[in-house]
């Protein structure tokens, strides 16, 4: 089991690194060189690939990558994607957002696309290498690796960016994909005898039908609606976090050295507490606690916006928000895993994560428009405060849906 946990830790790192480099850190790069909030918001649509991965998940179930597939179907896909991500990140490092924003966008899209395919294969591998009772530990290990990657791709990248050109920073980050390749090497891939090898249209249709058959039309529809609204607040707020810190007068080194370090420690605590809650509470109760925590901690950012730059206060609030994010991350992985049939592992998990991500990613594209609008009708500080009031309110529908589901279909985590 220890080798499985270590492998998932390294693969979690490989998942988190490209995602942050085409999302949060890219937002900081763009804002740092003077790109508008509106354009930065639209850039977040590049990572819609993570929300649409159910469309190409059947390929991961059906086909093996030539040469790479000798390692195993899942491991072959993961390693192939890691090589492609490395190349795409190098392409980003060769781009100049001021002279050719489109060129940067193309390579960012490629990194996001292959990052999403990598996630499909990693999720499938994680589900297949252990039974349900061990999924909480694997999810926590994956989240730990993911959060370490976030620290590296944000904190370390920001500190370097104060001393080096952003393009050199991305060159260095691309090399770190080797960590994920080590995770592939030490991971053992079992043979999944339950998997159904289907055409893409068959896989999507049958996995969808299987989900509704197992839960019933009413419960399945309720679950999909709950999943699609549960992460709205933090996903919509995400693209604007780095621009917000910079607009409030904090330096890249301050953000990287203190704020993001606190964020990692808090998120690690959050996902281990999430694992504890999964084992000791109803899964729906854990979902409710996580959703409420995200709503409250997001509101705290409005306090930062209304006060003068205070690094200690920002670190505290980022810590609380990161704790909530880690909590929700682990709980959400366990929740989605509990809904998946092993017959359609990759496709069904990708479908559910897509339902979780797609609404938030769609609205996050307008996050810069919203922030620019609020700033234009008030002041910089007041406008940002209004923005966080708006994102916090986005958690309310999910909390109501969880209570409806909890009252009628409460389930225990096993």
PLM regions and their residue ranges:
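Juxtamembrane intracellular "pre-TM" segments in multi-pass secondary transporters
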Residues: 1, 189-223
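Helix-loop boundary and gating motifs at the non-cytosolic
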Residues: 1-50, 221-226, 230-244, 248, ...
């Amino acid at each position: 089991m220890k080798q499985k946990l270590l492998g998932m830790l390294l693969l979690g790192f490989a998942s988190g690194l490209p995602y942050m480099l085409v999302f949060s850190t890219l937002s900081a790069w763009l804002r740092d060189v003077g790109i508008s909030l509106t354009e930065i918001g639209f850039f977040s649509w590049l990572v819609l690939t993570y929300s649409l991965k159910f469309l190409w998940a059947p390929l991961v179930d059906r086909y093996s990558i030539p040469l790479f597939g000798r390692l195993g179907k899942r491991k072959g896909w993961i390693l192939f994607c890691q090589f492609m991500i490395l190349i795409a990140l190098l392409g980003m490092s060769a781009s100049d957002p001021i002279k050719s924003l489109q060129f940067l966008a193309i390579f960012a899209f490629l990194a996001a696309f292959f990052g999403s395919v990598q996630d499909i294969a990693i999720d499938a591998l994680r589900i297949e290498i252990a039974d349900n009772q061990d999924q909480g530990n694997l999810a926590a290990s994956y989240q730990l690796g993911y959060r370490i990657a976030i620290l590296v791709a944000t904190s370390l990248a920001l500190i370097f960016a104060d001393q080096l050109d952003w393009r050199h920073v991305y060159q260095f980050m691309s090399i770190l994909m080797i960590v994920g390749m080590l995770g592939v090497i030490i991971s053992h891939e079992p043979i999944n005898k339950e998997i159904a090898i289907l055409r893409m249209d068959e896989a999507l249709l049958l996995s969808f039908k299987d989900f509704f058959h197992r839960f019933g039309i009413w419960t399945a529809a309720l679950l999909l609606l709950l999943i699609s609204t549960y992460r709205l607040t933090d996903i919509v707020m995400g693209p604007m976090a780095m621009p917000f810190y910079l607009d409030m007068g904090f330096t890249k080194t301050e953000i990287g050295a203190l704020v993001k370090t606190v964020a990692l420690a808090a998120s690690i605590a959050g996902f281990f507490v999430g694992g504890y809650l999964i084992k000791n509470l109803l899964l729906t109760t854990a979902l409710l606690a996580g959703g409420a925590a995200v709503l409250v901690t997001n509101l705290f950012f409005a306090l930062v916006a209304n006060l003068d730059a205070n690094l200690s206060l920002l670190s505290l609030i980022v810590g609380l928000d990161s704790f909530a994010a880690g909590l929700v991350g682990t709980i959400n992985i366990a929740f989605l895993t509990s809904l998946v049939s092993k017959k359609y592992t990759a496709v069904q998990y990708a479908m559910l994560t897509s339902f979780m991500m797609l609404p938030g990613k769609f609205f996050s594209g307008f996050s810069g428009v919203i922030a620019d609008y609020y700033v234009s009708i008030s002041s910089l500080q007041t406008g940002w405060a209004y923005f966080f009031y708006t994102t916090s309110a986005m958690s309310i529908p999910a909390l109501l849906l969880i209570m409806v589901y909890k009252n009628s279909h409460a389930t225990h985590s096993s």
